[in-house]
Amino acid sequence: MEEVLDILVVGAGPTGLACAIEAVLGNFSVLVVEKGCLVNSLFSYPPGMTFFTTRERLEIGNIPFNSVNVKPTRAEALEYYRGVTESYHLPVHYQERVVGVAGTDGNFEVHANTADGEQKCYRARKVVVATGYYDIPNLIGIPGEDLPKVSHYYGEAHAFYQRKVAVIGGANSAAIAALDLFRHGAQVTIIHAEAELSRHIKYWIRPDIENRIKEGSIRAYMESTVKEITPDSIWFENAQGERTRIENDYVYALTGYHPDFDFLRHIGVEVDPRTSRPNCNTKTRQSNVPGIYLAGVVISGRHTNEIFIENGRFHGKQIIADISKHLGARPSKNRGGEQTDPSQ
């Protein structure tokens, strides 16, 4: 007979891994299913990125994050989460996208498609959705947004030396990208719909970007909305309705991201039409669908600046505590005196 897992976790980001660790510590059988690679969103960050937070706030599973820097780098974070996954022997299936969840509490069927088109089905008593939000950008919805020269994800600046680059947006990621591009010799223009840059820009970045704009090193058009992108230009309109065209080689539309609301609705989770917040118990993290739990930024709707790794990593404890009440205690799976918790 096909194995029935106690818990299936959708998503192998830091929050999903933290949930899987709590399941292991509770002696539950668990599987993590991930559409990409381990901590896929972190892997997609710019290669030279440094986190804004300290290493202690990225730790999961009581395993110390050893870093030579107070604020760790992307490379250090990738190494850390690989190490955590190995330490807890977490079972993770990669390149499998979960496309549906059928059944009822205690008897779910989780359907997934592999990268090469194979269809898989897993059975699980409980399901935890920790899919993050970085995969779905907030589209502007204008002509030309689908051109090859437009990207919603910032990478490296070198390729844009002496090129005309527009950065759409005024939040933290837009400010960082604009500064990096400028320092690598690009001709940078910021186009932002609001009158001022976002208040969420980090305090040590704000003076830098504001001074570069003030001195004219980076052009900025505030209260301006992009209307069209063409192969060699970008059109935008200011608050007075005046249209402007500037020559352009590349566009970074850094207008934010959001969770996969369609997937949540597809598996039966109610999503508030106004805030896009899913129906989720704040104490247990269980959704309106009994047996389906939500963890991490996926519960924040469009308010994605509320939940980060720093606080989402604790959702696993809440979830497994509630699952334990329903499934009961599990006997220890330690073998040969080996510790289940590698941090011990």
Report the location of each language-model feature.
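Rossmann-like dinucleotide/flavin-binding elements
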Residues: 2-5, 9-35, 153-198, 283-331
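Iron-sulfur (Fe-S) cluster-binding modules
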Residues: 344
